């Protein structure tokens, strides 16, 4: 993945740029910086969800994204949340659910799961897509310490076993360190990477 962003503005106000970032499969980076600096906007540009920017974006790798709030199919079971959007087989999906501690919950709907379970389901779905690069937008925020530690461990294990790269948005440098991600700080106005 290569991004050469010249500028991103909201109306007349420039918020990002210039920013150059290259991340390949197996490489891990963390985007750090204060609230409102543009970390999520930058991640949305990388994901292709925000196309209103000046510059170029080349993404030959398959991407998967885990948002801060779980984005699940509420009318589908946990198993279907993995198989439908990703094309994973039922066996692959069941194995991933077991890997994230959701064995026996294959038939549960998202509303029947705790927030921590929903986040683990989101993580399993991202890996069911077999990404070359995983994009994560503050996925560990507002979790209790034990759940956060479990999610960090699961993420590290899945990254190691899949060989996927990582672009993590976080406020916490310790999360970046736990995942072996090279910290990059977004700062300034307009924000640039340092």
Regions found by a protein language model. Give the residues of each.
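Helix-to-loop junction immediately C-terminal to a conserved catalytic motif
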Residues: 47
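Conserved ABC ATPase signature
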Residues: 109-113, 117
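Hydrophobic anchor residue at the start of the ABC signature
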Residues: 123
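A short, proline-enriched helix->beta-strand linker immediately N-terminal to the Walker B motif
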Residues: 128-132
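Catalytic Walker B motif of ABC-type/P-loop ATPase nucleotide-binding domains
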Residues: 134-138
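Helix N-cap at the start of a conserved alpha-helix in ABC-type nucleotide-binding domains
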Residues: 145-147
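Conserved H-loop
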Residues: 163-169
């Amino acid at each position: 993945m290569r991004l050469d962003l010249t500028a991103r503005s909201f109306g007349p106000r420039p918020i990002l740029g210039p920013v150059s970032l290259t991340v390949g499969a197996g490489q891990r980076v963390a985007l750090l910086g204060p609230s409102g600096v543009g970390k999520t906007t930058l991640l949305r540009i990388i994901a292709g969800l925000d196309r209103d920017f000046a510059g170029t974006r080349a993404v030959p790798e398959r991407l998967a994204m885990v948002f801060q709030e779980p984005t699940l199919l509420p009318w589908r079971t946990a198993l279907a949340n993995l198989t439908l959007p990703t094309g994973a087989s039922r066996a692959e999906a069941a194995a991933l659910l077991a890997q994230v501690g959701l064995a026996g919950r294959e038939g549960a709907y998202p509303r029947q799961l705790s927030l921590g379970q929903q986040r683990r389901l989101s993580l399993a779905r991202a890996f069911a897509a077999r990404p070359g690069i995983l994009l994560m937008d503050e996925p560990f925020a507002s979790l209790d310490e034990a759940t956060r530690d479990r999610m960090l461990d699961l993420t590290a294990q899945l990254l190691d076993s899949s060989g996927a790269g990582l672009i993590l948005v976080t406020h916490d440098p310790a999360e970046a360190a736990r995942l072996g991600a090279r910290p990059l700080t977004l700062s300034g106005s307009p924000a640039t990477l340092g």
